[in-house]
Design a protein with these regions (language model features):
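Transmembrane alpha-helix termini and helix-breaking/packing motifs in multi-pass membrane transporters
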Residues: 5, 119-135
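Loop-to-transmembrane helix entry/capping segments in MFS-fold secondary transporters
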Residues: 15-16, 99-109
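Structural signature of the two symmetry-related core transmembrane helices
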Residues: 47-62, 140
């Protein structure tokens, strides 16, 4: 959401230019998605999420400091490529969860995600009025917190081996 705002507000992209960017993004993302899935299967969820969160942190800092429209467009495209690696969360969950718990846990996760999807944009929208850079630096911080959590994932997760530190009996 905020990357699009940046392109419009700071770099004065038109509706046609944003629409073209959406099309280009789809033309890149759709054929790349199966390859990302294969990459996750090859390197594992932990490594995939580590790559994703490092990439997103760098991208968000890039959004915060860029003065180049071309760089902002490249960051936007990379943002979506890295974000597509989030499917690793779903495969990780499938490996550690009891199959009987997946539906109810997915429902709770979906609900929490949607609450955050309403709350965070409103909060960040108010912050945006003060400084768009702060919004992107905050996004980078969230990515770094997610990175810390990904680093706590085992390389070979399964039921009973969900995290490296902080296991509860």
């Amino acid at each position: 959401v905020f990357a699009g705002f940046l392109l419009v507000e700071k770099f004065h992209f038109s509706v046609a230019e944003i629409s073209l960017l959406f099309i280009v993004n789809s033309l890149i993302s759709i054929p790349l998605a199966p390859r990302i899935g294969k990459l996750i299967a090859k390197i594992g969820e932990r490594r995939a999420l580590i790559i994703e969160y490092i990439g997103l942190a760098v991208i968000f800092v890039g959004y915060a400091i860029t003065e180049s429209a071309l760089l902002a467009v490249l960051l936007y495209l990379l943002d979506h490529i890295f974000f597509s690696m989030a499917i690793a969360l779903k495969t990780y969950f499938q490996k550690i969860a009891d199959p009987a718990d997946i539906a109810s846990s997915a429902g709770v996760s979906f609900t929490i995600n949607h609450i955050a999807a309403v709350f965070i944009p409103v909060l960040f929208g108010f912050i945006w009025l003060y400084s768009s850079a702060i919004v992107f630096f905050a996004g980078a911080m969230i990515a770094l917190v997610s990175l810390a959590l990904a680093l706590n994932m085992p390389s070979k997760p399964n039921a009973g081996n969900e995290v490296l530190l902080g296991k509860f009996s």
